[in-house]
Amino acid sequence: MLNEIEVGLICLSERKKFKEVYEEYFTALKYFAMRYVKDEEVACDLLQDVFVKLWEKGDRFENEMQLKTYLYRVVRNHCLTYIRDTQRKEKRMEGFEVEETEESFVHQMIEAEIYALINDIFEELPDACRNVYMKSLEGKSHKEIAEELHIAITTIKKHKTNANNYLRERLMGLLCFMMYLGI
């Protein structure tokens, strides 16, 4: 959450506040944009455009919820514009309409926030545990990981166990929330 010490307007023309907003929302907005464009690089490019426009406009917001809603809507609209433009360029626009309900928009917004939260929790792991776990997720065996990282297989197992325990503990509440939402 943004530092809400100051009460009043959130002004994006202030460099410090803009940087704070950028760092707070970029990851979640990237996952949100990827739901539309299906390409991380394109999603990042679109987000850069959105943040440049926000900086140039220097918008002011009454509170963080107003800012957050605005950011998600602008990113969604930017993604939809990109999709339409891409379709036109490829001359496949015939019959293409983007239909989206408010419910699916909120659902996608929540999913993007959840992915960002999971990513943040994963980043909390110690480097050694995270590296071993990533290689395991890539489908590598204990032996392959041990050879690549020059550590013992027992150490690999210990890192994976520690990572699993930490992730299980940190994600339990999130899992219950996701099940409640039906995600």
What label would you give each PLM region?
Residues 81, 89-111:
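Internal acidic/polar
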Residues 29, 33, 58, 71, ...:
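Hydrophobic-face residues of short alpha-helical interaction/recognition segments
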Residues 21-22, 30, 40-56:
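Conserved RNAP core-binding helix
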Residues 12, 51-66, 86:
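Sigma70-family region 2
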Residues 1-28, 35, 183:
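N-terminal module of bacterial RNA polymerase sigma factors
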Residues 148-173:
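DNA-recognition helix of helix-turn-helix
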Residues 5-9, 164-183:
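C-terminal edge and immediately downstream basic/flexible tail or linker adjoining helix-turn-helix-like DNA-binding
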Residues 123, 127, 138-155:
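Helix-turn-helix DNA-binding module
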